[in-house]
From Swiss-Prot:
EC id: 7.1.1.-
Protein's UniProt keywords contain Transcription regulation: no
A Pfam family the protein falls into: Proton_antipo_M
One GO term (biological process): ATP synthesis coupled electron transport
UniProt name for this protein: NADH-quinone oxidoreductase subunit N
Reactions that this protein is recorded to catalyse: a quinone + NADH + 5 H(+)(in) = a quinol + NAD(+) + 4 H(+)(out)
GO molecular function: NADH dehydrogenase (ubiquinone) activity; NADH:ubiquinone reductase (non-electrogenic) activity; quinone binding
Length: 458
């Protein structure tokens, strides 16, 4: 029971909160704030200082797993605060279904992070996927949201079939669904069955799809464009971090030193993601679609760290995805504070000249863009430097050069945002009331981007 206490706690918070919200509909805001407070307290339940594998060696706990879960939950809480303040800003009633879906999605991520066999991993990933489809289509009166969610659901269902097909291959040719058994066969067996390799590749396709890495990235621009901004902050932070940790587990606990998958396959996907993400964003005018391609690009960078055969590679990748999650949240909260209910229409045209009327927000967006480019001494520079340094240190020159090249290409459209704000003709934007939750998040992002490098170094 104690083994799955965080998962049970979050499930109860989600379900009981939903029941109270239905019974006392005029108190949704109070219930919502109580649930956020309970989620903050739940962070402490994720820490387990002793490593243990229970439920027939299928579910693991430990200090590293606890830290991973607490990071994911922390970013989830930020997304919930953004949704609350966004609803207040546009004068819309809080829909408690949003918090229920997100918390159940997090339970799925927690299960996936702790799982040590394929069936449990599949169940966790599918719980996350099903709730994500609903979050993508949460704007019921918006045809773009429904279209994006439908595309996401159809493609996600196809990838689910592939992952199940992969599990059947793994069990059929490997004789087990336990991670340790498959790891032993891949790393200690001179005659590896091709069916086992096919099964692992098919299962990996579902991870790459959820990460939006190329060539399984085509869903993400439409989903980002149609999804509510609060859902996007969750997709681009907590959900992505969770899936990166799951990929780490698969790379370390299943594939191990079997280089045809753990090196060649992931290397190709990393290069494709960097190239598609960098060049795909150049022609975009919508800022939400721009960030979708930016996600593809940055997932490509994260995969560089996954490929590297040492612990430093994993640290570099995890650090980079954390920095990117913070940067993305900062950017989207700035857009909410600028445009309110018109945030979905945010584009290069609508941000023209905002530096004249919204100096603070324009400055923060500029810092976010400079951090994404990797300009020192911002934290984004440190993340890229550490990642590329580790790649060069392990003789991965192709990946490092591709990363540097695509960073230069991406600088074009990141600087284009700054140019539109400071050097273009002014557009009139109505000043919106201050939401202190969003303001606090923005200031924390600013502190992290300016001083995060020094905190990490020391």
């Amino acid at each position: 029971m104690l083994l799955i206490l965080p998962e049970i706690t979050l499930t109860l918070i989600a379900l009981l909160g939903q029941c109270f919200a239905l019974m006392i509909p005029n108190k949704n805001k109070i219930i919502y704030n109580i649930v956020i407070l309970l989620c903050i307290i739940s962070i402490f339940l994720t820490f387990k200082y002793s490593s243990y594998e229970g439920i027939w060696h299928s579910f693991a706990t430990g200090i590293n797993i606890g830290i991973s879960k607490s990071i994911v939950l922390l970013f989830t809480i930020v997304s919930l605060i953004i949704y609350r303040d966004y609803s207040n800003l546009i004068g819309e009633a809080i829909k408690f279904e949003f918090i229920t879906l997100i918390l159940l999605s997090i339970v799925g991520i927690f299960v996936a992070i702790s799982s040590r066999n394929f069936l449990l991993l599949f169940c966790g990933m599918e719980l996350t996927a099903l709730t994500s489809y609903a979050l993508a289509g949460f704007k019921l009166d918006d045809i773009q949201s429904s279209e994006g969610a439908l595309k996401y659901f159809i493609l996600g269902s196809l990838v689910t079939c592939l992952s199940l097909f992969g599990i059947s291959f793994i069990y059929g040719f490997g004789g087990s669904i336990q991670f340790e058994d498959i790891l032993h066969q891949l790393n200690n067996n001179s005659e590896i069955k091709p069916g086992l390799i096919i099964g692992i590749v098919l299962f990996l396709s579902s991870i790459f799809f959820k990460l939006a890495s190329s060539p399984l990235h085509f869903w993400i621009p439409d989903v980002y464009e149609g999804s509510p901004i609060s859902s996007i902050t969750y997709f681009t932070s907590a959900a992505k971090i969770g899936m990166v940790i799951v990929l780490f587990n698969i790379s370390k606990l299943i594939i191990g030193n079997y280089y045809p998958i753990n090196y060649n396959l992931i290397k190709i996907i990393a290069i494709l993601s960097m190239l598609f993400g960098a060049f795909g964003a150049i022609q975009q005018t919508s800022l939400k679609r721009l960030m979708a391609y930016s996600t593809i690009l940055n997932i490509g960078y994260v995969l560089i760290g996954v490929i590297l055969p040492n612990q430093e590679g994993y640290k570099a990748a995890l650090l980079y995805i954390l920095i990117y999650a913070v940067v993305s949240i900062g950017f989207f909260t700035c857009l909410i504070m600028l445009f309110g209910k018109d945030v979905d229409k945010a584009s290069f045209k609508t941000i023209q000249g905002i530096a004249e009327t919204h100096k603070t927000i324009a400055a923060l967006i500029s810092i976010v863009m400079f951090s994404m480019i990797g300009i020192p001494p911002l934290t984004g520079f440190f993340g890229k430097y550490y990642l590329f340094y580790q790649a060069i240190n392990k003789q991965e020159f192709t990946l490092a050069y591709c990363g540097i090249f695509t960073s230069v290409v991406a600088a074009f459209y990141y600087l284009k945002v700054v140019k539109a704000m400071y050097f273009s003709k002014k557009n009139s934007i109505i000043k919106l009331p201050i939401q202190y939750g969003l303001l606090l998040i923005n200031y924390l992002v600013l502190v992290f981007l300016l001083f995060g490098s020094f905190i990490i170094l020391f």
